[in-house]
Structures are given as C-alpha cells and as structure tokens.
Amino acid sequence: MEALIPVINKLQDVFNTVGADIIQLPQIAVVGTQSSGKSSVLESLVGRDLLPRGTGIVTRRPLILQLVHVDPEDRRKTSEENGVDGEEWGKFLHTKNKIYTDFDEIRQEIENETERVSGNNKGISDEPIHLKIFSPHVVNLTLVDLPGITKVPVGDQPKDIELQIRELILKYISNPNSIILAVTAANTDMATSEALKVAREVDPDGRRTLAVVTKLDLMDAGTDAMDVLMGRVIPVKLGLIGVVNRSQLDINNKKSVADSIRDEHGFLQKKYPSLANRNGTKYLARTLNRLLMHHIRDCLPELKTRINVLSAQYQSLLSSYGEPVEDMSATLLQLITKFATEYCNTIEGTAKYIETAELCGGARICYIFHETFGRTLESVDPLGGLTTIDVLTAIRNATGPRPALFVPEVSFELLVKRQVKRLEEPSLRCVELVHEEMQRIIQHCSNYSTQELLRFPKLHDAIVEVVTSLLRKRLPVTNEMVHNLVAIELAYINTKHPDFADACGLMNNNIEEQRRNRMRELPTSVPRDKMAGGAQAEQEGGTGTWRGMLKKGDEGQGEEKTKLQSSIPASPQKGHAVNLLDVPVPVARKLSAREQRDCEVIERLIKSYFLIVRKNIQDSVPKAVMHFLVNHVKDSLQSELVGQLYKPALLDDLLTESEDMAQRRNEAADMLKALQKASQVIAEIRETHLW
C-alpha cells in the first residue's frame, strides 16, 4: 500500500502541468492559527530546515509539499542520472527540472516565489507553490501548508484579510478527499481552537480530522496536557498527537531537526511516560502516512470514475472544436451543407438533437396550424359584431327606394362578406408565427446541431443573414397568397355550394313545419279564401327556390316568438308632423313578426355560409404557408447558401476562427492528454497495492 502515495503524487504532477484542480486528490491540509507551529511541524516531518520562519504572518501562499521516500539504491541511481551530490534534494514545479540540494536555497526560493506573487509585505495569494522533497529519512506524504488564521490586518493586508484566509483554508479542507491536520498550541485553551472550529465546519463528524498539539514544553508551570492528549477535552476520531517544536532560540543557535526530535523524545519520556509512544514527531509521521494510504485506498474507485468521465467530456469538447482548417473550400462547403441538412431535418423532425423542453421546428409549426390557428378560427363568432340593427339596416339599404316584398339576396352577400373578412387577420397572424418559428430554427441549429459554426463567428453570422433574408423574401409572397385565399372567398358567394344547399333545405323544412303547426292552431271559422291562400302559398313554396322559401316564412306572422327589443331606423309614426330635412332617428319599438323572421333567416344563412368558408380557410391557409414559405425555404436553402457564400474571395474571411478558439482547443487537448496520462497512472496500480 506504500505505492499509493507516489501514485497520487504522480497524479498531482500531471494535473499541475495543466494548472487544473478539476480532480480533488487525497492530501493532508495543515490548518492552524498564526504562529501556532504549523511550519515547524512540517519541518519536523521533513527533518530539515526548509520553510521560512519568523514572527507574524510568514506562510502567505499555500505550499503543497510532497515527501518522497527514496531507498539508497534508488538514490544512487537518481544521483547518477541527475548529477545530484547528496542524499536529499528538492524540486519546484515552477523551476521545472532544477534540483536543489541546499535547503537554505529552497527556503530562499520559497520566499522569493511568495514575494513575486503576494508582494513583499503581508498580502496573501491562493496560488500554490509546489515543492517535492526526496529523502531516505521521510515517509511518503502529501501535505499542504496554509496561511495561519489571523484576526487583525497588518502591513498592506486588506481589511478583509481574515475572510480571505478563511476562504483559502476552506477551499482546501472542503475537499472531501483531504485529511485535515488541525494544529493547536498547548499553551492555549483547546476549547477556543480556531483550527478545530474551522475543521468542524466542513467535517462535523471529525472523520477526517487529526489534531496536533504543539509547544508541549511551553505550558504554564504546574499544568500538563494529559487530559488533552487522552482526548478527554476535545474528542477527535482520528486521534490527537502532541509534539515539541524548536524555539526561535534553538533555530538561531542552528539546532538541527534531528537533535530537536531526540530532545522531544526525552521530554515526552520524562513528562508523559505513559503516552510517549503515541506522541512525538516520528509517531505523527507514521500516523499521517497510514491515514493517507487508507484514505487514498478509499478514494481510488471514485477517482478512477471521475477521470474516465472527464476524459470522455474533454474528448467530446475537443471534437466539437474541430481540427485546424486545411482545405478551406471543402470545409466551407461541408459546413454549409451540414447546416442546410440540419435545418431541414429540424423541420421534418429527424434532427440528431431532439429538444425535450419545448416544441420546436416542424412540431411547433404543426402546433401553430392545428392548435393556435385552428382554435383562433373556431373562436371567431359567425355573427360577431353583427347586431339585429345591422341586419335590418342592410336589408333596407339593399332595397333602395322601393319597399321590400322579399328579403333581398344582396343584403345577405353584403353581410356575409363582412363576416368572412374577419378571417383574414388570424390567417396572416398564422403566417407570422410560422415565420418566427423558422427564424428560431436557425438559432436551434447553431446551438445544438452544428457547433462547428461557433468556431467561425463570421460564417455563422453570414449563414444567419442569408437564411433570414430568404425568409424575409418569402414572407410577402406568402402573405399575398393568404390574402388572396380570403379575397377568393369574398369574390364569389356560392349559394349553390352543396353544404349551403343542405342548410337551406333544412331551413325550408323547419319553416314548413312551423307553418303547418300554425295552420292547426287556427280557429275552424277561418274563411276559405285564407285557407286557399295558404294552399297557394304552399304550392309556390314547393318550388324549392329561395324566394319560395322566404314567401313561406311570410305566412308565419301569427307565430309566437320572443319579441326582440331593438332600435331601427324608421319613419315617424302617423299623426305627427315631419320636417323632411330631418335625418330619420332610431325609434325604440318592438320588431314586427316579419322583421323578426327576416333577421332570423339572414342570420341563419350567414352562420351556415360562414362555417363553410371558415372550414375552407382552416384547410387552405396551412397548405399555402407550407408551399410558399416552409417547403420553398427547404428546397432552396442549400442553393441559396452556396450561391451567396461559396466564393473564393470570402473563404479567408468566413473561416476566420474566433480569437480564443485556438487557445481553447489547445487547453482542451492538454487537459485530455493529462487525463489520459492520469488514467494510465491509475491503471498501473496493482490490486495487491490496495491491501
């Protein structure tokens, strides 16, 4: 299982090369308040002085420290290959292959790199420094040294320095694959430990938190850390380990880490003999190594899955970016053809990318025809906007100066044309809706079907312009045709239409039935000449003509109907003087039986004929729109695009990639290469390494 930590280090190196943190790798994050001894603990684990030391804020950038254990045989081999003279050496990621054998030089490089990014005062940065230490005296570990938690800004630190440091710490410890090393000084109250507090925010159960108590030798006289080290004060599931740091005086006197560890062991044996074997720097190193190995083992399956998923995603992304253009003519023709095909397929419903959130393309056009347009027509009232006064006025105006003996046919035509004209507006609105949907299909194809177009924004804009122009040209042609469909219906009122003749026949039968009912109700003393007159009317009505039908209705003056209250233009009643220069004024009175009958007949005929015309329009308008707009655009789109865009003079301009496309392609290629390498690294892990 020791082989797992080098594997994770390899993965970290792989992803560091592309500057990505999309994979959350197992690591140990060191958290603590400022000057609590975090860096001292890390130096004890390394066994060398390599970190900047001092008072105040010293660690101002995250330091990712990879400790790599090397055997003597491997060390000799590496020394020969790299020309390294020494058993321990370090490498920074930002200095590439440069090898440092002087640890003072490593410390100076950390300070220089920190100041380069964070400034030479007290500011912080979240950009990490990557350092790898090779030594036979270390165990395999990956640790992250983080800036200490502080409260008050100093130097050129911003006022929200506490919040910045907190967010930086949370960024690392929120990683569910990280172990939190919470460092607290023994000469402070554990109940007020900021490190444990912030660790508990992201790990409330303490499943991945290990507490370290530093400065055991600096506790007040007469006190000890027995209860704390036994876990009686703050219980932590992964354990609690005490260590002794070097003092600033020891550092000034050049006391080595090895001597410090030896003195630490002596102090623990003297002060805490029963706990000495479960505390100290060496025990901490072994514990961290064991915890990290088990943690990596638990995280590995999910890590494999994540890398495989990301590989597939970046492969798809790279494919969508396409290869650099070599043959411009072929590429342009291919993109134009693909767009035209996808546009037509979206209308036909055979597109590769089917929208699931809403209707689009041909399905939406169908919805417009049969739901939107169909329901709008059905909601148009055949007699809407037509009152009894309008009907009677039309009848009177149609007779001119002569009194009407029968209902004039001209009044029917006049009124029915007025009603049919109302179908034109929803028909033209239907054309507009289909036109808008065909515009939307352009964007749909750009977003879902032909992502290659996004590589070439000028080509995309040119295609949109050509298709929009084609649709714009077809719109007036289609509108004209739809207008003509309504005009055709208005041009000739066909009263011999089979459906209309049936309606007239039914009306004849209805009026005849009403007349017979009235005849039965007449008193027996009715004179014979009236009876004969009725028979004569029946004979005249039997011809089946419109005039005969209306004449039959004229006999029904005795029929009991609801008397409509209305105002009609009428002559002044007898007995009153009239100024002939006055305009006739409406007079409120009850309609006569004949006026009621005339209105009813005209209204029934209008309704019957209107329904016939509405049915025709509901059928013919979608056909006209399909022929003159949809199908015409489908058939001519390819040739229109080729004719407008496939020109040698336009090739260079149209196939100019967007500024960031080449960069994004390179980034995606680098990331894919890193993921493939990471997948290869994980694949090398033998199952025996896991146990």
UniProtKB/Swiss-Prot annotation:
InterPro entries: Dynamin, Dynamin_GTPase, Dynamin_GTPase_CS, Dynamin_N, Dynamin_stalk, G_DYNAMIN_dom, GED, GED_dom. It is found in: Cytoplasm, Cytosol; Golgi apparatus; Endomembrane system; Mitochondrion outer membrane. Residues 22-301 form the Dynamin-type G domain. CDD domains: DLP_1. Its main location: cytoplasm. Residues 522-573 are annotated as: Disordered. Its EC number is 3.6.5.5. Belongs to the TRAFAC class dynamin-like GTPase superfamily. Dynamin/Fzo/YdjA family. PANTHER family: DYNAMIN, DYNAMIN-1-LIKE PROTEIN. The GED domain folds back to interact, in cis, with the GTP-binding domain and middle domain, and interacts, in trans, with the GED domains of other DNM1L molecules, and is thus critical for activating GTPase activity and for DNM1L dimerization. This is Dynamin-1-like protein. It comes from Danio rerio. The lineage of its organism: Eukaryota, Metazoa, Chordata, Craniata, Vertebrata.
